[in-house]
């Protein structure tokens, strides 16, 4: 009887902590979202005059400015955060896809760039409702670069054939991406080795930071024009 009481009390305490944890991160997500909106409003204002009004400055909407050698292009990819904050793909220190540009969606967000000139060839997002990812990937030509960011659930569009195409673009993790995982990847058509620019976080209810979703991930660096 007494032991039962202790166990119930423990269960209640654990549940309360779990609820508290989720609400803490709801606040964090809200702050991220507010942060993004504010960054949109002040994107043409000097950074020193423009600090977001919310709790902390977590992941600002602008691209982290990066200088690369002349034969390389800077890029930056951030995955979506849970199903709340959209992903961001920057190329040459410019946002190509993001909340700011209102051109992102659940599923996979993808930008394709002409390798040497740096021209943006196409950008789109794919989920069960939009389809078309296979045709999109088949039109990627040798030397093109590809930048991929997950949002909410990347696995919905990943057929075996599509996973293999990503593997051919340098991905070592595309075959392992599961429902609601976080995945960011930069690769190239004609790449001979594995891309170093890839991160995957598994959706695991025991370690998820956002309830049904794991932590977000970022990857960035200098991508060689020629591969
Ligand atoms: C909430 O999210 C932040 C950032 O992702 C993380 O550092 C923190 O541990 C999370 N808090 C809880 C209670 O899960
Ligand atoms: C990349 O950025 C540099 C510096 O802003 C600019 O001069 C160049 O034209 C850009 N290249 C492309 C392909 O956008």
Where are these regions (language model features)?
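Short acidic-hydrophobic catalytic motif
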Residues: 1-146, 151-227
């Amino acid at each position: 009887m007494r032991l039962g009481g202790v166990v119930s009390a423990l269960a209640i305490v654990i549940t309360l902590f779990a609820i508290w944890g989720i609400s803490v991160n709801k606040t964090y997500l809200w702050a991220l979202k507010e942060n993004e909106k504010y960054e949109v409003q002040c994107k043409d204002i000097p950074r020193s005059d423009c600090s977001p009004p919310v709790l902390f400055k977590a992941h600002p909407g602008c691209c982290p400015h990066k200088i690369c050698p002349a034969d390389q292009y800077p890029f930056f990819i951030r995955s979506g955060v849970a199903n709340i904050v959209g992903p961001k793909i920057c190329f040459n220190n410019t946002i190509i896809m993001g909340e700011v540009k209102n051109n992102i969606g659940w599923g996979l967000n993808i930008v394709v760039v002409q390798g040497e000139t740096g021209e943006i060839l196409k950008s789109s997002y794919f989920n069960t409702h939009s389809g078309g990812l296979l045709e999109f990937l088949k039109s990627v030509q040798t030397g093109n670069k590809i930048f991929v960011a997950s949002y909410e659930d990347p696995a919905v569009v990943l057929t075996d054939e599509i996973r293999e195409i990503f593997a051919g673009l340098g991905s070592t993790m595309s075959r392992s991406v599961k429902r609601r995982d976080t995945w960011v990847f930069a690769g190239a058509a004609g790449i001979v080795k594995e891309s170093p620019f890839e991160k995957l976080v598994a959706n695991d209810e025991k370690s998820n930071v956002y309830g049904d979703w794991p932590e977000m991930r970022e990857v960035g660096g200098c991508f060689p024009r020629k591969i």
